[in-house]
Amino acid sequence: MKAFVVDRYGRKNGVRAGDMPDPELREDDVLIQIHAAGVNPLDSKIRDGEFKLILPYRLPLILGNDLAGVVVRVGSRVRRFKPGDEVYARPHKDRIGTFAELIAVKEDGVALKPETLTMEEAASIPLVGLTAWQALVEKGQVKKGQKVLIHAGSGGVGTFAIQLAKHLGATVATTASAANAGLMKQLGADIVIDYKKDDFAAVLKDCDLVLDTQGGKTLERSLRVLKAGGKLIGIAGPPDPEFAKQMGASWFLKTAVRFLSHRIRKAARRHDVSYSFLFMRADGDQLGQIAKLIEASAIRPVIDRVFPFESTREALAYVETGRAKGKVVVKIR
């Protein structure tokens, strides 16, 4: 099958187009013919080797982290899906590879595609949808009347998270450029802060939760806008000890993670708030719940551009510019 592959870690080594063996179907797998795949900043980070200590992939590695397609075959223990079903999925972190014509995904990571969406629209959802769901619903437990700040509202995670937070009944603030303020309001943001002109930490206070997609100084400054007992959830790092524990990390890696996150965890305690790192996991049941919200028109996909499969490298480069409004998708068939 045709695929886009990483042979060696590093930006300069890039991603090559090539032929790879068809995936092996395990007894609890669903074999999916991929029609479209989402393109995410995570793809570039994996290519560059940023996660090689935490996610020790065997190279060559097919890149790509979410998809929509049609079930071709199912393993002997699969009960929820059958050939011909239109599905969408985020594969488990150790079995990625959606920039390809076929993929085998464990049944519990798959859900029926929202009926109201095209394949390209559906492929834009899994990674960002699960990230927002696990941050706001699972970890954050956002409730009606709470105040939430979502950084980088015009990005893939941001455009989904704004809509989800609004659906949950929160007052939603976000940071974005003035050019994207209109889109942010359309998606449900109550407060839009122009990050080029205004300091969000001077504008906001008493937030119950901040979802940070930026890391660095933005992460640290976010502590200032939280009320006592508030939650800072970061998806750009640094990883925390709980994450290392979930990953089954070695003693050395656990120690390194504890050191890397010491400063932000200490600062959070000083502000009487909590910090946690989120590395989204595959979850077909949550994708099923997300599909219901989409079919009820509570959430809509936001897609910037769709690239043809042969232009996957260009799609990755476009995502790396940071200028995409919403998601970038590759159309495979």
Feature locations, PLM:
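Terminal helix/beta-alpha structural elements that buttress the NAD(P)+-binding lobe
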Residues: 1-26, 33-37, 44-68, 73-74, ...
